């Protein structure tokens, strides 16, 4: 940030790849980014602390499916609006990690898929944030979770964008045919020896296992440079 130049044999770039090209790199982006890229849907995540410890038989991961599967995905992928009948994912980390919340309470988060900022016309200002919070509060009440909220944090697509994620999605470039496998941005460039990429925007793709693999591949590339 202060203009200091640091010499290096290899540099691993891990920010979201399109944002790295836009803000950090004085290099032309790969072809898939020069065309109009397709981004994965985004999501809202509501982190909540509530009183009471998890039940002995409580599940760590729970998916609550909506009834109108096709309509929900039409809303998400074609219309670019909030799903009228969404499926939601609930994670209760306190089930297996007592340190996730103080004694006598528990942590959970609720994830609802939403359009990304490129495909949707949603404004995630204070009014929309408040409406989404109320929507998710109503969901946890209906689903039987404790609704006596002690602490909370709502993360929206705009928050993801503010954190440096292209199109406001934490799930990077969509796994379409033209953005998968050999067509996904590669983790090295022939015109920039020693520059290596890792993360969900490069190969092999999205998801914790694949991102971890991308780190392993990046380490191998760095090893090749340093030999």
Predicted regions and their residues:
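Conserved FAD/dinucleotide-binding core of flavoprotein oxidoreductases
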Residues: 18-23, 49-51, 102-138
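A glycine-rich dinucleotide-binding beta-alpha-beta segment and adjacent secondary-structure elements
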Residues: 85-89, 144-204
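Short glycine/proline-enriched loop/turn "hinge" motifs that connect secondary-structure elements
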Residues: 98-105, 186-190
